[in-house]
Amino acid sequence: LSLIVDEKSPEALPNLDFKIMQGNSLLEQYKGVDLSTMTEKKIGAGESLTFFDSMLDVYRKNLRDKLTEYYACPEHDKKMQLRKDIADIVKQELVEQGIHIDFEDMDLSANSQFFLWHTWFHDVFSRPSKEGFDIVIGNPPYGAKISSIDKACFKHIFTSAQTIPNIQKGSLDTFSLFIDLGYQILHTKGNAIFIVPLSVTASDAMSGLHRLLINHCDEIYVSSYGDRPRRIFESAEQQVSIISFKKSSNKATRIMTTHINKRY
């Protein structure tokens, strides 16, 4: 806000109405159905069209058009109607593919089952040569109870959750999964920063996450904090680390850490 106050001619803040959402952001699938390709073109150049494929492309074009209108809409009421229209198109597309999921009582933009990253943020993931977010910031939950079904899904989605004999141990702690997710949704050269439990630095269960970041991030910075002389969060007796990294196609060229800031 101070930057805006100091500006001679401050520009209007972006409309965040359509960007504030909730959901199970670790999953972009539901009951085994992949929901990440709702906006992708089904037919490539030179491929033959079937009626089924052409109908899917119609739904996906309608969805992309509605999303473009949704992003540009300044009116709250109209935006809510567009959100409903988008949800209806998603449901129609699934039915067209023979996928019958009962979404009747489920809000596709706010539910505890999944989150449609590539639909609601189509503008972010469709940028040429820059597919993904510039910045990801998180204070993820940790120690959550995970069903056996979700565990199997996470092991398929996140490389850091996979245990590979003699190479790495995988972790299914939610904070580790969120760091992996943050890495996935960044574009190359994008930056992420998370505040998470201190165990991210030393637990052998984090070796899968360490391997992912070291092999695919240019720079990694870690600052660690104890709970004395003062807690980072007054209401939580938790030692934490702040980890930031820059996504890359190369191995890490710089890893910087602090000694744990702790005093008895």
Show the residue positions of the predicted features:
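Signature of N6-adenine DNA methyltransferases within the class I
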Residues: L1-F52, K66, F115-Y264
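Coupling/switch/interface segments within P-loop NTPase motor domains and analogous charged loops
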Residues: T37-G132
